[in-house]
Every structure is written in C-alpha cells, then in structure tokens.
C-alpha cells in the first residue's frame, strides 16, 4: 500500500486551510497587485495647467532623476567665465560651503538666476527649484496630504469565519523644501520676495536651528532634521517692482547677502556673443547702446543684459524683414518698461539720438 499525504482537513474534496507556501504565494500575488513590492516615491508641484507635474517612480534609485525632472531646474546654458563672474561664483560657493544660505540681490536682467543655477549645479547635488509668487503658501514649500488610499482585506482563513478589514490612508506628498531638507539637495528659491512673508516663515527654523517643522503632521513625523548637505540660494530684485514684498528682517538676518549688479562691458559682450552667435562688432554695438540707455533711465526702467540678448537675437532675423532696422529693434525692446505714450516718445528719442 502506498501512503499519499493529503491536507489535514478537506471539505467536499477541497482544502479548508492554505499551506504556508500557499499563503506566501498569495501574499506575494496580493502585494504585486497592490503595487507594494517596492516603496513608491511621489513628487508633486504646482505649475501651469498644461504641464504634467505628477510623477510616480517605483525604484529608489530613480529618486534624483525624478526630482530634477519634476521641479524643472533651468539649465545654465551658455554660461561664460570672466574674472568678475568667477569672483561672484567663488563668493557664493564659499558661503554655501560654510553652511549659510545665500541671498543673491540685484536688478532684473543682471544674471542672478543663471549664476545661482550654475553654482548649484557645480555643487554636484540634485537641485530643486521654486519660483516665488503671490499665491505661494507654506504647503507649496513643504507639501501636504494630497490623496487617499483605500485598502480592503478579505480573509476566510477558517471556512465558516469571514473577516473583512477596510483601511483608509491619507498620503503625504513632499514639495521642494521638504525634499531638499530630507535628502540634502540644493534649493533655489527664485524671486522669493514675490512670496508673502508669512509663507516664508517656515524657513526661519530651517536656516537657524536646522529643523523643518511640518505643521500639518503629528508626532515624530512633524519634525525633519535638515540634512548636512542641504544648501539654499535665494534671489530677489533690489528694486521695488510691482508685486514685491519686503522680506522679514528675521529671515534676512539668517542669510548672507551678495549684491549682483550689471556686469562690466567685456563680460556683457561675451554673454551676448555666447547666447546668440553674432559677430563681436555687432555685440559691441548692441552693448554700447543698451549701456548708454541704462545710464539715462531710472533704476526700475534700466534695461539689463537680457535686453542685449533680445536685440541680438532680433538682429539675426533682420534679413527676413527688410522693413525693420536696428533702431526699431532697440525701441521695441526698451519699450517693455514703458508706462505712458509720453514715456514711449522719450525713450524713442533717446534711442534715435544714440544710434547713428
């Protein structure tokens, strides 16, 4: 007689209980179906409606790439190095290495953002990006509870006992500041003075005590110890433009301030050539005109290096538009900061007097 081992309890030919191997296989199958095999990293930000800003990455190794893709840090293309640029780079790098956040102050169009991005990339750490805005709140900086996950478990381990369990979880989604503090990323907070001061209060304890508090969380999860590799570069305009808020003194006191003025003549010429590919003599002509206009206009209306680049790019298309000349290009670019028809006429006359 041959003995065949069977399950200890069978009802109508079928096993009542699962074996240990069957239970393990069932758990693996359930976890796979629920997507629980590996931790998920989720990144979410506010941005224009036409952009897809939600990313769900399965593997831990993809975290850095996902963060940089989600927060869309601009590339510092065509960055040029001259003695004055290198000096600014060195000053920023020194204070960042010393552990202080750097506040880069300067007029619009002088190259603050390009410098901040370049220095941040040179640090060799992932970079996250925030653009200051009137509508930015504390949650936009640190994150918040964004979605609910409903999980149901049905268990009939014993044939005549049916157990059910419903669990509802609210998931927390980190935003740039939380990510930078947790993992030691470099934070660039562009035009931070456009954000209401109350929203930036969260930065006080980050910069001073090295602690990020998440007000909407509870218990141990409420506090994050700032990673030792965390760095922060904040930029703001030195002129009182529309939409600018004066930052609180307590925050300014925790940062090192570096003033970035318009670059010198040689540097501006090199920047224009590098960005547009025009000849040196044309770049010199453009920079001379813009710098002369800059000297004659009030601070809030001064054209920056960006204006030089715009005129130069316009020049590359003049052959296709024979009825437009260099003077008109200059007038159109300078007119972007015009407040009235009389102001426009004054600037037009200024350009005509400067351009032969």
Task: Tell me the role of every PLM-derived stretch.
Residues 269, 276-325:
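Conserved AAA+ ATPase small/helical "lid" subdomain
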Residues 153, 310-314, 332-333:
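Short secondary-structure transition/capping segments
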Residues 3:
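Cationic, low-complexity basic patches in intrinsically disordered or flexible, solvent-exposed regions
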Residues 68-71, 75-79, 324-356:
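C-terminal engagement/docking regions of AAA+ P-loop ATPases
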Residues 148, 315-318, 336:
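Phosphate/oxyanion-binding loops and surfaces in catalytic or ligand/nucleic-acid-binding neighborhoods
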Residues 20, 83, 281, 306, ...:
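Alpha-helix boundary/N-cap detector
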Residues 7-10, 14, 19-284, 288, ...:
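AAA+ P-loop NTPase catalytic core and its hallmark functional loops
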């Amino acid at each position: 007689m041959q003995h065949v081992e069977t399950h200890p309890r069978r009802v109508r030919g079928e096993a009542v209980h699962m074996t240990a191997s069957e239970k393990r296989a069932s758990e693996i199958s359930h976890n796979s179906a629920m997507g629980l095999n590996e931790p998920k990293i989720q990144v979410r930000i506010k941005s224009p409606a036409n952009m897809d800003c939600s990313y769900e990455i399965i593997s831990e190794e993809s975290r850095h790439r996902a963060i940089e893709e989600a927060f869309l840090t601009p590339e510092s293309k065509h960055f040029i190095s001259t003695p004055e640029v290198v000096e600014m780079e060195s000053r920023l790098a020194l204070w960042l290495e010393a552990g202080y956040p750097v506040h880069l102050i300067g007029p619009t169009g002088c190259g603050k953002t390009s410098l901040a991005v370049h220095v941040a990339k040179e640090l060799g750490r992932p970079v996250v990006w925030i653009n200051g805005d009137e509508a930015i709140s504390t949650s936009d900086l640190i994150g918040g509870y964004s979605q609910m996950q409903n999980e149901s478990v049905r268990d009939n381990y014993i044939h005549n006992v049916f157990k059910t369990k419903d669990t509802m979880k609210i998931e927390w989604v980190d935003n740039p500041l939380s990510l930078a503090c947790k993992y030691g990323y470099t934070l660039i907070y562009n035009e931070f003075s456009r954000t209401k001061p109350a929203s930036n209060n969260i930065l006080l304890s980050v910069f001073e005590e090295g602690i990020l508090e998440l007000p909407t969380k509870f218990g141990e999860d409420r506090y994050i110890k700032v990673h030792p590799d965390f760095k922060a570069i904040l930029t703001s305009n030195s002129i009182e433009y529309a939409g600018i808020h004066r930052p609180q003194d307590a925050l300014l006191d925790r940062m090192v301030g570096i003033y970035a003025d318009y670059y010198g003549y040689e540097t501006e010429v090199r920047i224009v050539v590098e960005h547009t590919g025009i000849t040196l003599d044309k770049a010199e002509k453009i920079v001379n005109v813009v710098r002369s206009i800059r000297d004659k206009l009030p601070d809030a209306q001064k054209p920056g290096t960006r204006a030089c680049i715009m005129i130069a790019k316009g020049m590359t298309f003049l052959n296709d538009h024979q009825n437009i000349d260099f003077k008109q290009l200059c007038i159109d670019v300078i007119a972007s900061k015009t407040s009235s028809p009389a102001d426009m006429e004054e600037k037009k006359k200024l350009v005509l007097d400067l351009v032969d």
